[in-house]
UniProtKB/Swiss-Prot annotation:
Gene that produces this protein: cmk
Stated name of the protein: Cytidylate kinase
Keyword ATP-binding part of the UniProt annotation: yes
E.C. number(s) listed in UniProt: 2.7.4.25
Similarity section: Belongs to the cytidylate kinase family. Type 2 subfamily.
Organism of derivation: Natronomonas pharaonis (strain ATCC 35678 / DSM 2160 / CIP 103997 / JCM 8858 / NBRC 14720 / NCIMB 2260 / Gabara) (Halobacterium pharaonis)
Any GO molecular function: dCMP kinase activity
Reaction(s) the record says it catalyses: CMP + ATP = CDP + ADP; dCMP + ATP = dCDP + ADP
InterPro entries listed in its UniProt record: Cyt_kin_arch, Cytidylate_kinase_dom, P-loop_NTPase
Keywords: ATP-binding, Cytoplasm, Kinase, Nucleotide-binding, Transferase
Top-level taxonomy: Archaea, Methanobacteriati, Methanobacteriota, Stenosarchaea group, Halobacteria
Amino acid sequence: MLITISGPAGSGKSTVAAGLAESLGYEHVSGGDIFRDLADDRGLTPLELNKRAEEDDQIDRDLDRKQRDIAESRDDIVLESRLAGWMAGEHADFRIWLDAPLSVRAERIADREDKSVELAHNETKERGKSEALRYREYYNIDIEDRSIYDLALNTARLSPDGVRAVVESAVNAYAPDDDEGQTPVEGVTYEF
């Protein structure tokens, strides 16, 4: 089974994806892992590649193509990134969206990255706007469209263990024989 976990920065997707993969005995592949591999392939550090990505849209496209390739060719995996649900498309068996209010996500990011909440809030807000524009421009994806997801959860309402329990319960309850059809991923331009 291919499970995707998507959501904005600070939503808890990495924490939940790692825990879910561990409990299922699946491999966890994150967009961050793929990005680090791309940096390695180019002989760059992730920070250097990130700087180049600001000027070169092909870097984002390479990351997204890798996600799509993984979704097409692998199974028993939890694929996690902002666009994992969209990039996996019809190959995903179960798509999950995690979110939290911007103020909560900013606090989490500030704690994780040892910066002020105000700075994290401003950076996260700007990053979200920038990503939304790029996703629309590159692939015709409206990142605010949650219709493709089988489960959407506000992670601010539960502890990390509570979020993981809800996600695990939903995934374990999923039975392919009872599946009457997932929402198709339509209108996306997979041009990398």
